[in-house]
UniProtKB/Swiss-Prot annotation:
One of its GO terms (molecular function) is ATP binding. This is Glutamyl-tRNA(Gln) amidotransferase subunit A. It comes from the Bacteria. It comes from Aromatoleum aromaticum (strain DSM 19018 / LMG 30748 / EbN1) (Azoarcus sp. (strain EbN1)). The keyword Zinc does not apply.
Length: 490
């Protein structure tokens, strides 16, 4: 059961081969046994999980089960969960118990999924390694001296180690796709606005988007189907018909299932900066796509190299505004001693926020300040439009764009902690996708030096999630990279 797909788990639950309570207990016991070495979870909600599992068993007995009824999952600790700690990986919210559920959490509860707890993350989703968490870094299950990626590193590590079959995450500049690549799982960030941000603690509002982790594209498709949908409480939520992202996956197997699919290869993604072992795995995966009938064409994203500087103006600017609400008055950390209100604000924020969060708040405040707004923020927004236009021009000549998800495999804990620029460069292939608001997916495609996973990124046009998932699914039907498990998951 530990390594079963969602389809296999659904069949076992429906056939009464295992109950929801037994399944939840199986994974909860694994968390208790293994998470001390991974630190993938901030909060484990055993009592709440078993209560939800009993309710799921009642639904199954009544013939009212949906695809996710009784399926265990975990939520990134950026999603508000009623009655359960919601920390966002920060001292500022270390004791915050949310009074309501995020829209995503509510949808998955309604679907009957069983939440086992909340996963570790970089503080306020600011980071690429999960080292910025107030609760200590999550560890990569393939090598616990290495990072799992970030900011959704806990969710990725939990799925890779089979502490849960699926997990939610968020992606602002690569925070689902990059950890998916570094831990050898599949992760998808949908088109901006497809998943509601209501109850998802904000970092950069024009970039944040909920996403899904699973062992396979098929598992991600089922989770994303349940997460997506219009929410009037989120002004950026898109009102679109409900979509089943699994709809193309059941087609009969064919010798060349991807015949006619044109894959664009941006020259900017295959230049200097990509590690040799990553390049070898990515090129072998592209050969695999060609063997399935796809053709590859060269495309260009001429402004892609400007994505990181544009992002690190726009995202901190939005963060400086979003995080101004954490002042120690209504909720969150409050300094123990202060002389007046102003000192309470300053001391509470100084004590509650970590170094990277403070760095980004300072940068954001600076670029929005009088005299610098035009020079920095407006210029970054212009670059953002150019990057989006580049993607549209490239996608006019292909169906999906492919390349590496991360320029390297997972690095050792502490290796880049003192060099923010090197840390930021780890998202060089993912950030542009967020700036354009496009859907992106990462799936395992091989291993690099030290038997560390490598991910291939697929990017599509707006609302092409089903196409990306289908392409990844066909690749996974013909390969077994997504079935490889770290020794800790045995």
């Amino acid at each position: 059961m530990i390594n079963a797909s969602l389809t296999e788990l659904r069949a076992a639950l429906d056939a009464r081969k295992i109950s929801s309570v037994e399944l939840a207990t199986l994974f909860l016991d694994r968390i208790e046994r293994l998470d001390a070495s991974l630190n993938a979870f901030i909060t484990v909600d055993r009592d709440g999980a078993l209560e939800a599992a009993r309710a799921a068993d009642a639904r199954i007995a009544a013939g009212d089960a949906g695809p996710l009824t009784g399926i265990p999952l975990a939520h990134k600790d950026v999603f508000c969960t009623e009655g359960v700690l919601t920390t966002c990986g920060s001292k500022m919210l270390a004791n915050f118990v949310s009074p309501y559920d995020a829209h995503v959490v509510s949808l998955l509860k309604t679907a009957g999924a069983v939440s086992l707890g909340k996963t570790n993350m970089d503080e306020f989703a600011m980071g690429s390694s999960n080292e910025n968490s107030h609760f200590g870094p999550a560890k990569n299950p393939w090598d616990t001296t290495r990072i799992p990626g970030g900011s959704s590193g806990g969710s990725a590590a939990a799925v890779a180690a089979r502490l849960v079959p699926i997990a939610t995450g968020t992606d602002t500049g690569g925070s689902v796709r990059q950890p998916a690549a570094l831990t050898g799982v599949t992760g998808i960030k949908p088109t901006y606005g497809v998943v509601s941000r209501y109850g998802m603690i904000a970092y950069a509002s024009s970039l944040d988007q909920g996403g899904a982790f699973g062992a396979s594209a098929a598992d991600c498709a089922q989770l994303l189907t349940a997460m997506a949908g219009f929410d009037p409480r989120d002004s950026t939520s898109l009102e679109r018909p409900a979509e089943d992202y699994s709809r193309e996956l059941a087609a009969p197997a064919a010798a060349r299932p991807l015949a006619g699919l044109r894959i664009g290869l941006p020259k900017e993604f295959f230049g200097a900066g990509m590690a040799d072992d990553v390049r070898a795995a990515v090129e072998a995966a592209l050969d695999g796509y060609r063997a399935l009938g796809a053709t590859t064409v060269d495309v260009s994203l001429p402004n892609a190299q400007l994505a990181i500087p544009a992002y690190y103006v726009i995202a901190p600017a939005e963060a400086s505004s979003n995080l101004s609400r954490f002042d120690g008055v209504r909720y969150g950390h409050r300094a123990a001693e202060y002389r007046d209100l102003a000192e309470m604000y300053s001391k509470s924020r100084a004590e509650g926020f970590g170094a990277e969060v403070k760095r980004r708040i300072l940068v954001g405040t600076y670029v929005l300040s009088h005299g610098y707004y035009d020079a920095y923020y407006l210029q970054a927004q212009k670059l953002r439009r150019l990057i989006a236009q580049d993607f549209q021009a490239a996608l006019a000549g292909c169906d999906v764009i492919a390349g590496p998800t991360s320029p390297t495999t997972a690095w050792t804990i502490g290796e880049k902690s003192d060099d923010p620029v090197q840390m930021y460069l780890s998202d060089i292939y993912t950030i542009a996708v967020n700036l354009a608001g496009l859907p992106g997916l990462s799936h395992p495609c091989g291993f690099g030096a030290g038997e560390l996973p490598v991910g291939l990124q697929l990017v599509g046009d707006y609302f092409s999630e089903a196409r990306l998932l289908n392409a990844a699914h066909r690749f996974q039907q013909a390969s077994d990279w997504h079935l490889r498990r770290p020794a800790i998951a045995a």
